[in-house]
Amino acid sequence: MDGSVASSSVWDTQKVYKHHEQQNVAQTRPKYREGRRLKAVKVYTINLESRYLLVQGVPAIGVMAELVQLFALYGVIEEYRPLDEYPAEQFTEVYLIQFQKLTSARAAKRHTDEKSFFGGQLHVCYAPEYETVEETKQKLQDRRRYVNWASQNAAKLHSQQAEVNTESSSSTDTRTAEAPIMQKNPEEARRENVNSDYMGFPLLPLPPTADISYRLQNHFTQPSQLQWTKETTEDKMGSLHNFIPPVQKTSTQSESSSSSGVKEGDLRQKQKISTPSIRFMPRTTHLESRKRKLDEQTFFLKEADKTGVLIGPKLPELPKLDMEDSSLNVTANLIRNTMTKAASVPEAKPVQAKHTTPKPRRRI
């Protein structure tokens, strides 16, 4: 910092410093750093940053109030004034604005530099030469405090991530240690996995085949030894998407291992019962058979209701009035029967007349 600036007042220096000048566009910028706005690459340290901003290129048309309103969007402004004796271009003015916080000044410079303002282009730069010794000391202390806080947070996050990684690795090690290692005969393992899922994923359904399935009993199978089976496997909706065909294993039976042959025969018989062959049925045929079964069930239920014996108390019958005369009793019974017949007959709905449109007239 210049000694003359420190000894004099804050607002007295009118010297043009090198960092006040606008730099040219860097032509050596790499391709990946090129953007829409051609700006010089500039890195600011804490010494170069400041709460004081020097605004150049303001049109000299009395727009100080609008300028202050624009910069007030980014933070609290403590003080501002025009620098009349500062060398500037013709018909432009230079203003000095002091913000309350350094972050506000940083945001204001980033957003207002090279901004169009009332027909002119603003040039905003830091002015640390207007700071006092106390302000510079406070700025450095704040920066040191922020660096300590950021480094501590980074170390804490790193330690937490390391703990999480160690816990996950220890849990995986314990799981692998607890898991027992079972050694099985390859023939038994292959036999157990006949109708099971492979690697946790279900088997894909196979396309429908013919009704006849051939099952081989030995490696050398004769045509007379083929078995012909016809069994249904569709579900209630006539679909075969849940069907898994049986996998038959051919094994040679030795005379010495008779017990193993018996077990294998039992296993094949169970597989035959549990997983029959495929039979394809069209949906229309399935629906017709289902409807026929329902009709038969309802018919048998009605027949059972008619012929079945009723158990329990009967409902009280309607009281019959005695007219003390045979002719009156006959008339009353006739009226009563007619009323019951009329009540039992369903109401006839009125026939709606069809509205026919008149035929168009023929033209001669």
From Swiss-Prot:
Comp. bias regions, Polar residues: 157-174
Cysteines joined through disulfide linkages: none
Domain RRM, residue spans: 51-129
Comp. bias (Low complexity): 247-262
GO MF annotations in UniProt: RNA binding
Region (Disordered): 157-191, 239-291, 343-364
Keywords per UniProt: mRNA processing, mRNA splicing, RNA-binding, Spliceosome
UniProt-listed Gene3D superfamilies: 3.30.70.330
GO CC entries: nucleoplasm; spliceosomal complex
Origin: domain of life: Eukaryota
Signal peptide from the UniProt entry: none
GO biological process entries: mRNA processing; RNA splicing
Subunit relationships: Component of the minor spliceosome, which splices U12-type introns.
Function comment: As a component of the minor spliceosome, involved in the splicing of U12-type introns in pre-mRNAs.
Family, per entry: Belongs to the RBM48 family.
Record protein name field: RNA-binding protein 48
Underlying gene: rbm48
